Amino acid sequence: MNISHKLVVIGGGLAGSEAAWQAAEQGIKVLLYEMRPFGQTGAHKSSCLAELICSNSLGSDLPDRASGILKAELRRMGSLLLRCAETVSLPAGGALAVDREQFSYLVTEAIEKHPRITILRQEIIRIPEETTIIASGPLTSHGLCESLINMIGCDNLYFYDAIAPIVSFDSINMSVAFRASRYYRGKQDVGDYINCPMSHDQYEVFFEFLLNAEAIELREFEGQLKNGVTAGSRQYFEGCMPIEVIARRGKKALLFGPLRPVGLVNPHTGKRPYAVVQLRQDNLAGTLYNLVGFQTNLKIAEQKQIIRLIPGLEAGEIVRYGQMHRNTFIFSPALLNPTMQFRNRANLFFGGQITGVEGYVASIATGLLAGLNAARLLQAKPLLELPRETMIGALCYYITHAMPSDYQPMKANFGILPPIELQRRLNKRERAVAYANRSANVLDASIKCL
């Protein structure tokens, strides 16, 4: 390796491209490894950097949406990829959609022309001793995964995610739902779960819809998901299987699985429900709850309808939809600092989906922070930890402090931000505007000295 390169970046996806650019802009010489086109992932189609392999939408660009706030922060911090996306944007209402080929071309051109970035088109299977950013993405190669396992242990590297939908607490109808833990007999403890009870008839409607709901087609290398896989923490997600697959095993399969009612009594009726959907607290603030055992591959429109069939969630606000797919990611709560620095090796950083963030823009954001901090480390400057009041800071804090029992990839949403203390109660849109204003003010104060 050329010793004039001070920083190695592994992966030329969204996070790696942004990280390389940010470090180079700080005066650091960067060696960027990308194995395509000589090594393929099974999902990518081209050799371009920052290829979008799923949707061509980067989510809402409205200033009072979580994704819009994240983009506003990236603009303030000089994101290359966001600038490229806006250059080739397409009409998409309030969303930022792009011409995917032109987007990747612009990013590739910018990286190739940067005087301090060298691209090396080959697979890297050993983690270098030099200052390094690992941004190898959800389809990290087998060879690099082996090196990661040797470094962090097999229990801290996952190959599938099993994401259950998350709803906001404020949208749960507690006159229908109730708090309880199974077999609870005390009087003081109100229970750790919110339970949505179903009658026999309600379950029949729910089951029939689930049985006929349309699922996302799996890629060839994701076929194992149909039979259950280890996804996320092995202690909690061994043998994860989509809820729609369980339903196809028989009408009562769910009643002996995630919807089992045993040990629960509905205080509104004094009887045991026929079926129960349990919601588990997902963040320390208690503003988000996930649907226990509801990992799914159903299309988003189908998920929305089926969640609205659950008593107590008729008006449920879904802040994250469920999914199960091939996704290499590390157990960040035990391994990373919010600066994206590896705890056990000061000159190693991670960025992108491998850290446990979800979505294009979140990947760009963590890549940006990793690139800045790797450069700051090399320049003997203090690392930048963004405040939790910013969306980037909140995401980085969440993935590095999440509760182990519920650790799964997370996207930008208002539920991970600290609550705003105000004199009067705000409606949903007013609260979103307040979050956006606070984010802008806090971020400006944090980066003005950079």
Please give the residue ranges for each predicted region.
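A conserved beta-strand/loop capping segment in the N-terminal third of enzymes
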Residues: D61-T108, E112
